[in-house]
Amino acid sequence: MGDTITLLSRREIEKMRQAGQLAAALLDHLAPMVQPGITTLELNDEAEKWTKAHGAISAPLGYNGFPKSICTSINEVICHGIPHRKRVLQAGDIINVDVTPIVDGYHGDCSRTFFVGTPSPVAEKLVKVTEECLRLGIEAVKPGGKIGDIGAAIQSHAEAQGFSVVRDFVGHGISKIFHTAPQIPHYGKAGKGKRLRPGMVFTIEPMINEGTWEAVLLDDGWTAITKDGKLSAQFEHTIAVTEDGVEILTLGE
């Protein structure tokens, strides 16, 4: 990931909007499948089929060697969980599903955490707070503001609720390139970091943990889990900085 921040034109942002809307529609399509007894590979295969049927490409497949089309991160998995035929969803699980279709060369990147059956009280609170963190991070985006404003808004809310913010994985610039500048930490201090300018497009994707923020990478080289084995949740949108605020590009129709 380089340091050069590319400002997108209105036409390019429209392309990103089209990709983002398809990503949101894919999550809407997968949501009813998230039930006890289904495997993460079944979710992956349906996502791949649906993406192809809509004339798009699954960006994660083969990206730096990633073997599947989506990421499925269950319970203590923070991010980049690999779908597998033996990973069966159980009642009480939480699962983050992260999708990135490519439409006409542009990436639409978003994720949601779903409940599998009835969640525990702590899981329910964690997921609620994580979604609130995403909303607060987006609300902190203003032209002329700083990247640190985003992380500060997220971190203050998460920690006030007794949770922690993952440090090892951050949001990122995105367009025709999957991951590019700027990096968007989900922690930090308001007024710090690079200035937000109209035309910047990036993801905000807070990963919030029940316990410690520390992560451990598994031997597969992809799956990151919480160091203490406690729960982690995540929500993600791709956004554009506008002349007067912010636009979420990964909203459904």
UniProtKB/Swiss-Prot annotation:
Keywords: Aminopeptidase, Hydrolase, Metal-binding, Protease. Its EC number is 3.4.11.18. It catalyses: Release of N-terminal amino acids, preferentially methionine, from peptides and arylamides. It is an enzyme of class 3 (hydrolase). Its cofactor is Co(2+); Zn(2+); Mn(2+); Fe(2+). A divalent metal cation 2 binds at residues 109, 172, 205, 236. Belongs to the peptidase M24A family. Methionine aminopeptidase type 1 subfamily. Monomer. Removes the N-terminal methionine from nascent proteins. The N-terminal methionine is often cleaved when the second residue in the primary sequence is small and uncharged (Met-Ala-, Cys, Gly, Pro, Ser, Thr, or Val). Requires deformylation of the N(alpha)-formylated initiator methionine before it can be hydrolyzed. This is Methionine aminopeptidase A.
